[in-house]
């Protein structure tokens, strides 16, 4: 426990360096960009990994010394064939609590399992050796003896071959290899050679567990130099070949144990995982192959396999709880699951090995051929937390593998086949369609986009006074009476014809075309002519704030129509043309008595006003000398007795005699 406390202290120091991680709102973790390049953090992680590797190596060396001392005692004292569950469980717990050791030598006829990181593998003759003695009849009591076999190997063998130094591992990979070190338990009778698949733990099976066929218990086989106990004869032995990271060192599994009787196989559910190892026999009975499977906490599943040519039968149970293996290894024996497994009597006949399921989904237990399974009446399950996953069932193939380089081949099978390791699949949830609000919003957005594309903002004139919508483009705009309309909105209120470019009448807030206005009964609201007093039903002429018929608007002198012609009126509102106005109303010259008219080509008249009299410009001069009079010096007018004189002439008139009338001097 002191060693584990030291590891806990080292781990707590390492966790303190992780305070740079920042918790995000979505529940995940994100790291600061600068923290990933922190040399202090990288140095701490490297030092921590190096220390952990050294501590782990020291533990392995100490356990190797203890193992070497225990091996001779285990070889000299084989266990007799008594059904002692407590003692065997204790041995299994002691063996599993220690990290595994690699065994350099293997007895003939025994199963051999090598870690995935080791470069060398046993040959086909060592891995698959049919018994030369053949099948021997044995007693039923021999199979009921429990034989837990434990083998240990260094956990460093589970590392990748390209990275033997634990300090080069990442944080997650190092803990996977350290905490999930898997011991190898394996021992075979001479007549029951087995094949190690190199992926996960192996279950070497012997066809001697058929309770209906007698087996021989008289033969003993050489013991493997490990902590092992094997019953004499053809007992159904238990063996576990653990490999951590069978493929690249990433897959780690913990030791498991199989307790079998002559008519049943009992599986301890407290184990964390069970791998796969195929056991073959020279008898034509068949071969029991354990297949990987992960049941739920209260369920188990099995899938028997059958080879049509050789009569091989495969079944498997794999349990992967999410708990550590050390507490239950120290608590003593657990309850087990007993499942009967009858074998076929001939090689050509279909044989099945049942898979017992308790509250399991049908996909976790399937039988491909043969009879229905018969579970044993004694079935005890030790509850553990586990994660269910699917079991892949493949037909006509007793070979199970995940890597072509580590794929073993059973005797007699033409080609090896692959099987997918159990994995937990996440089913995608149902896709939810858009809601009603989202559909409406999308429709409005598309409509707005279409309007903006069809009508650029540069052609926007304003809002129509009739429909209150925007007016885009000069071709749709129509302006009348100071208001803006759409071309389609400015129509006659009676016939709905467009009035753009046509005469229209605006009556009582409504717009009418000329025809509808004349013949639709709106005459009572029409204007009357100022001259004749009749209603204006046709064209109207407005002048001086009054309405006229165009034919009524004429000059009172010449009677010519003044529509579109300049005109003027007098004080009595009589209409004159400009020419007649000047003739009739033009002022008359006080000298000659003629009217003062504007010159030709002009509407303006030029006149001289003196003594409240009007004169032509040429008529305004001295009556005696004829000097043109004006405002200049020497040309000023000096009237005398209503006559126009210059200054000299005026003096002369005064010297001759006084005039009875007063003289008035005007200056212009």
Curated annotation (Swiss-Prot):
Phosphorylated during mitosis. Residues 54-128 are annotated as: Mediates nuclear export. GO terms for molecular function: metal ion binding; transcription corepressor activity. SMART domains: LIM. CDD domains: LIM1_Ajuba_like, LIM2_Ajuba_like, LIM3_Ajuba_like. PROSITE patterns: LIM_DOMAIN_1, LIM_DOMAIN_2. Its main location: cytoplasm. Residues 464-668 are annotated as: Necessary for nuclear localization. Ubiquitous. GO terms for biological process: cell migration; cytoskeleton organization; miRNA-mediated gene silencing by inhibition of translation; miRNA-mediated post-transcriptional gene silencing; negative regulation of canonical Wnt signaling pathway; negative regulation of DNA-templated transcription; negative regulation of hippo signaling; negative regulation of osteoblast differentiation. Disulfide bonds: none annotated. Induction: Up-regulated during osteoclast differentiation. Residues 181-256 are annotated as: Interaction with EGLN1/PHD2. It is found in: Cytoplasm; Nucleus; Cytoplasm, P-body; Cell junction, Adherens junction. Residues 74-160, 239-258, 277-309, 340-414 are annotated as: Disordered. One of its GO terms (cellular component) is nucleus. It comes from the Eukaryota. Keywords: Cell junction, Cytoplasm, LIM domain, Metal-binding, Nucleus, Phosphoprotein, Repeat, Repressor, RNA-mediated gene silencing, Transcription, Transcription regulation, Tumor suppressor, Zinc. Residues 396-434 are annotated as: Interaction with RB1. Belongs to the zyxin/ajuba family. Adapter or scaffold protein which participates in the assembly of numerous protein complexes and is involved in several cellular processes such as cell fate determination, cytoskeletal organization, repression of gene transcription, cell-cell adhesion, cell differentiation, proliferation and migration. Positively regulates microRNA (miRNA)-mediated gene silencing and is essential for P-body formation and integrity. Acts as a hypoxic regulator by bridging an association between the prolyl hydroxylases and VHL enabling efficient degradation of HIF1A. This is LIM domain-containing protein 1. It comes from Mus musculus (Mouse).
């Amino acid at each position: 426990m002191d060693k584990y406390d030291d590891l806990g202290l080292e781990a707590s120091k390492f966790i303190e360096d992780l305070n740079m991680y920042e918790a995000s709102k979505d529940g995940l973790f994100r790291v600061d960009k600068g923290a990933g390049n922190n040399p202090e953090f990288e140095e701490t992680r490297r030092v921590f990994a190096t220390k952990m590797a050294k501590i782990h190596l020291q533990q392995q060396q100490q356990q190797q010394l203890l193992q070497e001392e225990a091996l001779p005692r285990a070889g000299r004292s084989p266990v007799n064939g008594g059904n002692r569950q407590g003692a065997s469980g204790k041995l299994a717990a002691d063996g599993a609590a220690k990290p595994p050791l690699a065994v350099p030598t293997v007895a003939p006829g025994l199963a051999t399992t090598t870690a995935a990181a080791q470069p060398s593998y046993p040959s086909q003759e060592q891995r698959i050796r049919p018994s030369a003695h053949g099948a021997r009849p044995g007693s039923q009591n021999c199979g009921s003896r429990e034989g837990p076999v434990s083998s240990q190997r260094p956990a460093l063998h589970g590392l990748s071959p390209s990275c033997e130094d634990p300090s080069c591992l990442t944080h997650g990979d190092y803990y996977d290899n350290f905490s999930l070190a898997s011991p190898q338990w394996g021992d075979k009778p001479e007549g029951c050679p087995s094949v190690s698949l190199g992926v996960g733990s192996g279950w070497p099976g012997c066809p001697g567990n058929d309770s209906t066929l007698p087996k021989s218990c008289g033969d003993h086989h050489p013991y493997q130099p490990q902590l092992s106990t094997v019953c004499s004869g053809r007992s159904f032995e238990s063996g576990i070949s653990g490999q951590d990271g069978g493929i690249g060192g990433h897959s780690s599994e913990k030791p498991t144990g199989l307790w079998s009787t002559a008519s049943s196989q009992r599986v301890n559910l407290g184990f964390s995982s069970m791998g796969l190892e195929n056991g073959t026999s020279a008898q034509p009975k068949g071969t029991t192959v354990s297949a990987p499977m992960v049941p739920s906490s209260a369920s188990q599943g099995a899938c028997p396999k059958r080879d049509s040519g050789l009569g091989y039968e495969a079944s498997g149970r794999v349990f992967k709880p999410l708990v550590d293996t050390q507490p239950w290894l120290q608590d003593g024996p657990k309850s087990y699951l007993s499942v009967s497994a009858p074998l076929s009597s001939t090689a050509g006949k279909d044989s099945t090995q049942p898979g017992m399921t308790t509250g399991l989904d049908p996909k976790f237990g399937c039988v491909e051929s043969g009879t229905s399974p018969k579970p044993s009446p004694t079935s005890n399950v030790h509850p553990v937390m586990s994660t269910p996953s699917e079991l892949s069932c493949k037909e006509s193939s007793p070979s199970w593998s995940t890597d072509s380089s580590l794929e073993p081949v059973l005797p007699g099978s033409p080609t090896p086949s692959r099987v997918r390791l159990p994995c937990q699949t996440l089913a995608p949830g149902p896709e939810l369609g858009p809601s009603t609000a989202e559909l409406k919003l999308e429709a409005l957005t598309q409509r707005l986009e279409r309007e903006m594309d069809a009508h650029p903002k540069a052609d926007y004139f304003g809002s129509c006074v009739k429909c209150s919508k925007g007016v885009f483009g000069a071709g749709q705009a129509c302006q009348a009476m100071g208001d803006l309309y759409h071309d389609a909105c400015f129509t006659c209120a009676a016939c709905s014809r467009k009035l753009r470019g046509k005469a229209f009448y605006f009556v009582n807030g409504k717009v009418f075309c000329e025809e509808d206005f004349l013949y639709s009964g709106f005459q009572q609201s029409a204007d009357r002519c100022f001259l004749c007093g009749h209603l204006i039903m046709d064209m109207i002429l407005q002048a001086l704030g009054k309405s006229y018929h165009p034919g009524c608007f004429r000059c009172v002198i010449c009677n010519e129509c003044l529509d579109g012609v300049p005109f003027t009126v007098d004080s009595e509102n009589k209409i004159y043309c400009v020419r007649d106005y000047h003739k009739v109303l033009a002022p008359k010259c006080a000298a000659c008595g003629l009217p003062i008219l504007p010159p030709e080509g002009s509407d303006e008249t030029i006149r001289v006003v003196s003594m409240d009299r009007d004169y032509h410009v040429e008529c305004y001069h001295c009556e005696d000398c004829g000097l043109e009079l004006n405002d200049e010096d020497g040309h000023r007018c000096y009237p005398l007795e209503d006559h126009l004189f210059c200054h000299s002439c005026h003096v002369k008139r005064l010297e001759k005699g006084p005039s009875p009338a007063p003289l008035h001097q005007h200056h212009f």
